[in-house]
C-alpha cells in the first residue's frame, strides 16, 4: 500500500511538472507573440517618423533652410532633435528583435490614384498619357518582394546559412523572369510595328530598347529608385545610384506582374512605355538590289554613271557613304553598312531625282 501511495504521489508530481511546463510554454509563446506585435508597432511607428523626417528635409530644401537649428527656430522646442531621437530609439529597438519584419514599399505619388481601383486594362491607359499608370500588384507578398534587394534580405536574416531560403524574399528571381518577358514583349512590339525590317535590324533595335539604360529610365518614372529597399552597407556603397540595380527593379516589377496573372496588362504597359522611342524610329525602305541595273539600263545611253566613296570607314556602326555621279554631277548620296548597300541606296535615290528633273543633269 505504501509503495502504491508513493507511486501515485510520483505520478502527481510528474503531472504537476508537465502542467507547469505547459503553462510556461504558453507564457513564453504569449511573450513571443506580444514581443512580435510590439516589434511590428515599433517598426510601423519608425517608418512613419522616417517619412516625417524626409518631408521635413524636403521642406528645408524648398524654403532654403539648411540646418536643424533653422527647423528648431521655426518650430519651438528642438522639434527636429526630438523626432530624430525618437526615430533612432525605435530603430534600435527594432534592430534588436530576433524576428525580422519586411519593409513594405511605399507608393509613388503618381500611382496613388490606382491603389483603390482594379488593375488597368489596355483601355484604361488614356491616349497621350505618359508615363502610363503603374499597374498595381494584387498580391501582398509580391508587393513586398519586388522592392526587396538581396542585400536587405541578408541584413534582416543575418543567420540564414542557406541562400535558397531567401529566394522568395528578395527580388532577383522576379528580375530574371521580368528580363525574359521584357525581351519577349519588345520583340512582339517591334516585329509588329516594323514589318519590313530584317532580322539583323530588329535585333539591333531590340538591344537598344531592352538595355539597362531604358529599364533604368522606366523605373525612375515611377520612383522605383526611391522605393527600393537596400541594406545599410548597400546604401553606403551608393547602390541606389547604380543604373543596373534600378533597371533590375523595373524588370522585377514586370516579373511580379506576370506571376500576379496580369500578363496582358504588363504587355500593354511595356507597349505604352516604348511608344515614344518607337515613334522616333525612322525606317529605311528595303534595299532594291536591282537599282544599279535599272539606273544603267535607263540612263547609260544618255550619260556616264559612276559611284564614288565620299565618307565612312566601314564597320556596322560607321558604314559607308557612296555618291552616285551622272555626267560629272552628284545626283544622290546614301549610307549603307557596306559599300554595296550604300551604292544600291544611292542608285535608288538617283532614279527618283532623275525622273523628276533629268534636264538638270543632261549633257
UniProtKB/Swiss-Prot annotation:
The lineage of its organism: Eukaryota, Fungi, Dikarya, Ascomycota, Taphrinomycotina. The modification Phosphoserine is found at residue 122. It comes from Schizosaccharomyces pombe (strain 972 / ATCC 24843). Residues 13-22 have a biased composition (Low complexity). PANTHER family: RIBONUCLEASE 3 (PTHR11207:SF0), RIBONUCLEASE III (PTHR11207). Residues 1-35, 92-138 are annotated as: Disordered. One of its GO terms (molecular function) is ribonuclease III activity. Residues 139-262 form the RNase III domain. Optimum pH is 8.5. No activity at pH below 6.5 or above 9.5. It catalyses: Endonucleolytic cleavage to 5'-phosphomonoester. Keywords: Endonuclease, Hydrolase, Magnesium, Meiosis, Metal-binding, Nuclease, Phosphoprotein, RNA-binding. InterPro entries: dsRBD_dom, RNase_III_dom, RNase_III_sf, Rnt1/Pac1_DSRM_fungi. It is an enzyme of class 3 (hydrolase). Residues 24-35 have a biased composition (Basic residues). One of its GO terms (biological process) is RNA metabolic process. Pfam families: dsrm, Ribonuclease_3. Its EC number is 3.1.26.3. SUPFAM superfamilies: dsRNA-binding domain-like, RNase III domain-like. GO terms for cellular component: nucleolus; nucleoplasm; nucleus. Residues 285-356 form the DRBM domain. This is Double-strand-specific pac1 ribonuclease. Digests double-stranded RNA. Converts long double-stranded RNAs into short oligonucleotides, leaving 5'-phosphates on their cleavage products. Probably inhibits mating and meiosis by degrading a specific mRNA required for sexual development. Its cofactor is Mg(2+).
Amino acid at each position: 500500500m505504501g509503495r502504491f501511495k508513493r507511486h501515485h504521489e510520483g505520478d502527481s508530481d510528474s503531472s504537476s511538472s508537465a502542467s507547469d511546463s505547459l503553462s510556461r510554454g504558453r507564457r513564453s509563446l504569449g511573450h513571443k507573440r506580444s514581443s512580435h506585435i510590439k516589434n511590428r508597432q515599433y517598426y510601423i511607428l519608425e517608418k512613419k517618423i522616417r517619412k516625417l523626417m524626409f518631408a521635413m528635409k524636403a521642406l528645408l530644401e524648398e524654403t532654403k533652410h539648411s540646418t536643424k537649428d533653422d527647423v528648431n527656430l521655426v518650430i519651438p522646442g528642438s522639434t527636429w532633435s526630438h523626432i530624430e531621437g525618437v526615430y533612432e530609439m525605435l530603430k534600435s529597438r527594432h534592430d534588436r528583435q530576433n524576428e525580422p519584419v519586411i519593409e513594405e514599399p511605399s507608393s509613388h505619388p503618381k500611382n496613388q490614384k490606382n491603389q483603390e481601383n482594379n488593375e488597368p486594362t489596355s483601355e484604361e491607359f488614356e491616349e497621350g498619357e505618359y508615363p502610363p499608370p503603374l499597374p498595381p500588384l494584387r498580391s501582398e507578398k509580391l508587393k513586398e518582394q519586388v522592392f526587396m534587394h538581396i542585400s536587405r534580405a541578408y541584413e534582416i536574416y543575418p543567420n540564414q546559412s542557406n541562400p535558397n531560403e531567401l529566394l522568395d524574399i528578395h527580388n532577383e528571381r522576379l528580375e530574371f523572369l521580368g528580363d525574359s518577358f521584357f525581351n519577349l514583349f519588345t520583340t512582339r512590339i517591334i516585329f509588329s510595328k516594323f514589318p519590313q525590317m530584317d532580322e539583323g535590324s530588329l535585333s539591333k533595335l531590340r538591344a537598344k530598347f531592352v538595355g539597362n539604360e531604358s529599364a533604368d529610365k522606366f523605373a525612375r518614372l515611377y520612383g522605383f529608385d526611391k522605393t527600393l529597399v537596400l541594406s545599410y552597407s548597400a546604401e553606403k556603397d551608393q547602390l541606389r545610384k547604380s543604373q543596373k540595380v534600378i533597371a533590375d527593379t523595373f524588370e522585377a516589377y514586370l516579373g511580379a506582374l506576370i506571376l500576379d496573372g496580369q500578363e496582358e496588362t504588363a504587355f500593354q504597359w511595356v507597349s505604352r512605355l516604348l511608344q515614344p522611342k518607337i515613334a522616333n524610329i525612322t525606317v529605311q525602305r528595303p534595299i532594291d538590289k536591282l537599282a544599279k541595273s535599272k539606273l544603267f539600263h535607263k540612263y547609260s545611253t544618255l550619260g556616264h554613271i559612276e559611284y564614288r566613296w565620299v565618307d565612312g570607314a566601314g564597320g556596322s556602326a560607321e558604314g559607308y557613304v557612296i555618291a552616285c555621279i551622272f555626267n560629272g554631277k552628284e545626283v544622290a548620296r546614301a549610307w549603307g553598312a557596306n559599300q554595296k548597300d550604300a551604292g544600291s541606296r544611292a542608285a535608288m535615290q538617283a532614279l527618283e531625282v532623275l525622273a523628276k528633273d533629268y534636264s538638270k543633269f543632261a549633257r
